[in-house]
Design a protein with these regions (language model features):
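Class I S-adenosyl-L-methionine-dependent methyltransferase catalytic core
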Residues: 1-169
Length: 169
């Protein structure tokens, strides 16, 4: 089990500035923001700081949700893809059921190197045990992920929509 699958002292790990610089876009809303945003650099106009899954999301969103325990990301990703306009950040746990479900719904996914997230006190954290996936939903997200790939942030992949294999038999 990875560190992010266990319950720790805090689920607050902030995205470093260079990720947003590579994306080159601004967001209408950060749907998983902390109350104290002193060390948060998300370029967003509005911030949801509590009960986000119960709130109405609008516009082009940024989502770096609490990773929590096993399958804690599933409800966040379900709401993200239902919303259909934004970029989400998660671990790149390709064998996890939530990851495979999200893969089927994504327009694009950017696989990054390990990101040293920012602690609530503003200091960089240690290198995580795995890489990160940035999920794109909608045209603006696709453009931002394409730009980030060109900037060298990661490798861009697009899920293949499965068709009935019997059509080829």
């Amino acid at each position: 089990m990875s560190y992010w699958e266990t319950t720790g002292h805090s689920d607050e790990w902030y995205t470093p500035t260079y990720v947003f610089d590579a994306l080159g876009c601004a967001f209408d809303m950060d749907v998983a923001a902390p109350e104290d945003r002193t060390h948060v650099c998300t370029p967003a106009k509005r911030f949801i700081t509590s009960d986000s899954l119960l709130q109405r999301w609008s516009g082009f969103i940024w989502m770096n949700p609490p990773f929590g325990g096993r399958n804690a990301l599933a409800p966040w990703l379900d709401k993200f893809f239902d919303h259909g306009d934004g970029i989400a950040l998660t671990p790149d746990r390709t064998s996890a059921p939530w990851f495979q479900d999200a893969w089927r719904r994504a327009d694009a996914v950017l696989f990054t190197r390990k990101i040293r997230f920012i602690r609530p006190d503003g200091t960089p954290g240690v290198s995580p045990s795995n890489g990160t996936a940035l999920w794109g939903s909608g045209a603006r997200a696709n453009g931002a992920l394409q730009r980030a790939a060109h900037e060298g942030l990661g490798v861009l992949a697009r899920p293949v929509r499965l068709i009935d294999w019997r059509d080829f038999a």
